Regions:
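A beta-strand edge to alpha-helix "cap/lid" segment located at domain peripheries
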Residues: 2-12, 77-155
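A solvent-exposed, acidic/Ser-Thr-rich amphipathic alpha-helical stretch
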Residues: 40-106
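A short, hydrophobic secondary-structure junction motif
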Residues: 24, 52-54, 125-131
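Short, low-complexity N-terminal intrinsically disordered segments enriched in polar/charged residues
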Residues: 1-34, 41-42, 46
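Generic recognition of cysteine residues
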Residues: 32-35, 62, 149
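Short, well-structured alpha-helical interface segments that form or flank functional binding sites
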Residues: 26, 63, 123
Length: 155
């Protein structure tokens, strides 16, 4: 085969990119798991670069591990979001060396203290960096497009 993409260097570069994309998918899955584990601030913050930013675009951003932990800890203590389920789909991930970008569709459901079920529809725009050899969030931005109560009577 004469195409460059099939020579050893081309194959190794393509394999590296596929491995990077898979590592980023797993990073996002770990983020969702941390959120769904009663908003475990330690677990979520550990997924970010030390000065990484978590930002729900409806509120002020949280910069750095301490701010991210505090934000998620406040959600946990308040009990305002229980039994959450973050479902992300349709990822578009572009890797460029030790940095990458990603866009994900989001569907989240949760229950509030009055046992009402809520649904959030939106998307994430993320930037990632390879930090000490491991993919981490540089910036995670959540954009909410719809926020609605599914069952106001708790049924």
């Amino acid at each position: 085969m004469t195409e460059d993409r099939f020579d050893d260097r081309g194959l190794l570069a393509r394999l590296r990119q596929l491995e990077d994309v898979e590592a980023i998918r797993r990073l996002k899955a770990a983020y969702c798991a941390g959120c769904d584990d009663d908003h475990d601030g330690d677990a979520v913050a550990a997924l970010f670069a030390p000065d990484g930013v978590w930002h729900d675009t409806r509120i002020a951003p949280c910069e750095g591990h301490a701010a991210i932990k505090a934000h998620f800890g406040a959600i946990r203590v308040s009990g305002r979001i229980a039994r959450s389920s973050h479902m992300v789909t349709n990822p578009v991930i572009d890797v460029d060396g030790d940095t990458a970008t990603g866009r994900w569709s989001l569907l989240m459901q949760y229950t509030d203290p009055a046992d009402r079920r809520w649904r959030i529809v939106g998307f994430y725009r993320d930037t990632y960096e390879r930090y000490e050899g491991i993919w981490r969030f540089r910036r995670l931005e959540a954009y909410v497009q719809d926020y609605s109560c599914l069952h106001a009577d708790g049924a």
